[in-house]
Amino acid sequence: MEFVFLGTGAGVPSKGRNVSAIALQLLEERGQTWLFDCGEATQHQILHTSVRPRRIEKIFITHLHGDHIFGLPGLLGSRSFQGGTTPLTVYGPKGIKQFIEVALSVSTTHVKYPLEIVEITEEGTVFEDNEFHVETKRLSHGIECFGYRIIEKDIQGALLVDKLLEMGVKPGPLFKRLKDGEVVELENGTILNGNDFIGPPQKGRVITILGDTRYCEASRELAQDADVLVHEATFAAEDEQQAYDYFHSTSKQAASIALQANAKRLILTHISSRYQGDTYKELLKEARELFSNTEIATDLKSFPVDR
């Protein structure tokens, strides 16, 4: 599991930062990539990374401001043009379906893969399978905006091979049956319960990715005990009133949410273009004064998510 930040700016592109898009690489977990937001030129940013459009399985849109969605039509079309055939699902607020369908229709763009568009109308679970569970809550922004909590389900423990070998069980079909939790009888009459030969499960990771938002309770709830919290930090602490007026957060407010939620790690993104050069490091300094395990994303930077 690895983050690749494709765009980390706020509102409009700048020389140093493109607009919002985050790839969550799940190559080891499911051989796929999930994308969170898709601002203008996202597909161009992808060219500079290891992200492959054909592997993008899901796109989660936080809200419908242009800096979070204007890259969608181009990416969807290019994925088809480049030979993508596997299904893709886009999740987002009401209106995302109309935006995509009109853009593709007017431009006579035809995708050759199954494209499903899911409009989120209620908080709660938006996706679940045997590996992941994705929940959402409304945030506090000028328009409807969602944050996402991605919960990796616990992974079954490893088969205790050494313990089986000590009992004279040889590698082969019995190993698989025991791994599946079956009760088996050996040739000498010994009964073995597979559950007795499985190590402790690996606890799944929790990732929280928030859209644009003021400081709010929903952010804390989504981030509770997260292994990684990705939070916007559009403004410095001294501009807290301006952040409130424009429905955004400061770096210190992001750190406060991480602290209250008992998150393990905080990554700041959505940085205003007013912070050019190294001036953005002041945002990082402010956040670390409150929550030490804070990092700040820059375009094309990767962050592995360890267990």
Swiss-Prot record:
Uppermost EC category: hydrolase
Family of the protein in this entry: Belongs to the RNase Z family.
Return the PANTHER family for the record. Answer: ZINC PHOSPHODIESTERASE ELAC PROTEIN 1
Q: Which organism is it from?
A: Bacillus thuringiensis (strain Al Hakam)
| Cofactor(s) named in the record | Zn(2+)
Q: What is its EC number?
A: 3.1.26.11
| Keywords assigned by UniProt, alphabetized | Endonuclease, Hydrolase, Metal-binding, Nuclease, tRNA processing, Zinc
Provide the protein name.
Ribonuclease Z
Matching HAMAP family: RNase_Z_BN
Q: Where is the active site?
A: D67 (proton acceptor)
